[in-house]
Design a protein with these regions (language model features):
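Intrinsically disordered, low-complexity regions enriched in serine/threonine
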Residues: 6-173
Length: 173
């Protein structure tokens, strides 16, 4: 059994997500992941800004509430930082040429692969979501994250962290 729930807030396109996995037969550990980017693959791999795993024993149910609350409290500051970073990126205009240069740069850094380039370009030129039509760094970020959805499960979180770090380094430069 697995799933992800995202809590939306009124002032942001971002939402705090909680992912979970469990098994009835104790064949895998109970897992909870929390953050702005949470992924639970159908092979039950679990990643997030914060991930907590607990061996599935007969007493695991007494610990689940505490594990979940602890994960949520610890992830709030990371989530608030992502929200703050998003607001900063929204204030940085980006032309098509700047987006194409950055696209080449992140490809060169190995954040995206060749199959993702057309996806990023399409999402940049014709965003799937109206909220990303503005020509700014935030829209570019979301074009890239749309392409990252096709990443192999074992590298999706690493790639999300890499694009976030790379674009925030761009902001600081």
């Amino acid at each position: 059994m697995f799933g992800v729930h995202t809590f939306k807030n009124g002032d942001s396109a971002l939402g705090l997500s909680i992912g979970f996995r469990n098994s009835y037969d104790r064949s895998l550990s109970v897992g909870i992941a929390v953050g702005a980017s949470v992924f639970v693959c159908d092979n039950l791999m679990l990643t997030g800004d914060l991930t907590v795993l607990r061996k599935h024993t007969s007493n695991v149910h007494t610990d689940i509430d505490g594990l979940a609350l602890s994960a949520i409290y610890r992830s709030r500051s990371a989530f608030n930082q992502v929200k703050s970073d998003a607001e900063v990126m929204k204030q940085i205009p980006m032309s098509d040429d700047e987006a194409y240069r950055m696209l080449g740069f992140i490809y060169g850094r190995g954040i995206i692969n060749p199959r993702m380039i057309p996806v990023v370009k399409k999402e940049w030129l014709e965003p799937s979501h109206d909220v990303f039509e503005d020509r700014n760094l935030w829209s570019f970020y979301n074009a890239v994250t749309e392409a990252l959805k096709s990443s192999p499960p074992q590298s999706i979180m690493e790639r999300h962290l890499a694009i976030h770090k790379q674009l925030m380094n761009h902001v600081a430069a």
